[in-house]
Amino acid sequence: SIVSQFLLCKKTKEKVTVALGGDGGDEIFAGYDTFKAIRFAKIIENLLPRAIHPAITKIIGIVPRSLSYMNFRFKLQRLLMGIGHKEALRQPLWLSPVGKNEVEELFESQVNLEDLFSEAIIEWEKCNEKNPIDKSLQFYGNIFLQNQILTKVDRTSMMHGLEVRS
């Protein structure tokens, strides 16, 4: 997304010197599907024993593939990826572009998820909210919004002398 942001800022600077950006809304107003997943994960964990989660994952493999963005099968697979793990691991797992198996295949070795996501776990544990959704909002604000999204917008806009307000 940094390339598209760069090009957008370049084109915008041709007409204005200050622009209003739209980044950050999902992180502030719980717009991501991961916030819905928190509720579904709790329901699944309360209703279905952990022992049958692998079977559910295999059943999801039967769901037809789709090329559409964030399709039903993808959402189900992501949801199940976080279930059974402590809350501190769920958001990093759901946000990760690849799963544990893909990382292990890439590095040809076993991966400990707590080691892989240690920085995210530390940030999660710093959050003082008790409710999982509120804690996730705080987590997104502290790690994702501050260190990634807004930094990307700031740097790409400043490269073109464009002031972007979020």
Language model feature labels by segment:
Residues 115-125:
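A short, charged helix-loop
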Residues 69, 124-125, 129:
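General secondary-structure edge motif
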Residues 1-116, 152-166:
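ATP-dependent adenylate-handling active sites, centered on carboxylate activation for C-N bond formation
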Residues 127-140:
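Structural motif
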Residues 145:
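Phosphate/pyrophosphate-binding loops and the adjoining catalytic core of nucleotide-dependent enzymes
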